[in-house]
């Protein structure tokens, strides 16, 4: 029997969002717990974790303009079922009981800067009073719109070429569930493309398997 279903909120390869609520419902229907990895989606959507329905949602806050700190949301009913992993005197403290070494107080305090950053953007573009969740949604919409405007020319250009094929959706907009992560299948080797882009001032990080020559010399 399936006990735990783990899945990403969004593909980190083709940039396609998964239906978290639908997956969570399907898993819950058979009595399974769900764990959603949001690291590839969080910077593009600032998700409403409560509305998604998953039991666990986690991501790294450096993806959302914060420190290099892991953030995990666990529904209370599930958190109370999990075995304490911390000191015995923290067994009843939910935000401590799953952290064996104890909270990293400096990193946690630094996470407040993420809210300050979102509030600063909201004040600049909108101003006025609004609830924190409403401010976050408004800023997320601004950021997503900007991402789409930047990505559109690239997708149009790639779509016009016969030596490159976009993997995943070519359509933009929140309704398509597509975030600005682009994967390609190209006629040329990735190394040649990276070198060519570098000559035009485009930063490229190239990750490849060792070549036969490299393997033979090791």
Where are these regions (language model features)?
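Structural detector of well-ordered beta-strand residues that form the stable sheet scaffold
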Residues: 35-37, 58, 167, 205
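Active-site PLP attachment segment
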Residues: 51-94, 102-110
């Amino acid at each position: 029997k399936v006990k735990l279903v783990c899945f990403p909120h969004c593909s980190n390869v083709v940039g396609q969002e998964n239906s978290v609520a639908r997956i969570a419902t399907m898993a819950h229907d058979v009595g399974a717990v769900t764990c959603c990895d949001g690291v590839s989606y969080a910077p593009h959507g600032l998700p409403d974790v409560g509305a998604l329905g998953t039991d666990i949602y986690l991501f790294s806050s450096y993806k959302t303009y914060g420190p290099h700190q892991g953030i995990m949301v666990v529904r209370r009913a599930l958190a109370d079922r999990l075995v304490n992993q911390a000191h015995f005197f923290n067994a009843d403290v939910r935000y401590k009981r799953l952290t064996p070494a104890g909270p990293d107080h400096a990193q946690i305090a630094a996470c407040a800067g993420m809210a300050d950053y979102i509030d600063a953007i909201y004040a600049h573009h909108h101003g006025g009073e609004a609830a924190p969740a409403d401010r976050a949604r408004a800023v997320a919409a601004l950021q997503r719109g900007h991402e789409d405007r930047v990505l559109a020319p690239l997708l149009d250009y790639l779509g016009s070429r016969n030596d490159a094929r976009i993997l995943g959706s070519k359509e933009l907009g929140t309704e398509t569930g597509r975030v600005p992560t682009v994967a390609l299948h190209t006629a040329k080797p990735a190394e040649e493309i990276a070198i060519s882009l570098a000559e035009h001032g485009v930063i490229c990080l190239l990750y490849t398997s060792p070549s036969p020559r490299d393997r033979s010399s090791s």
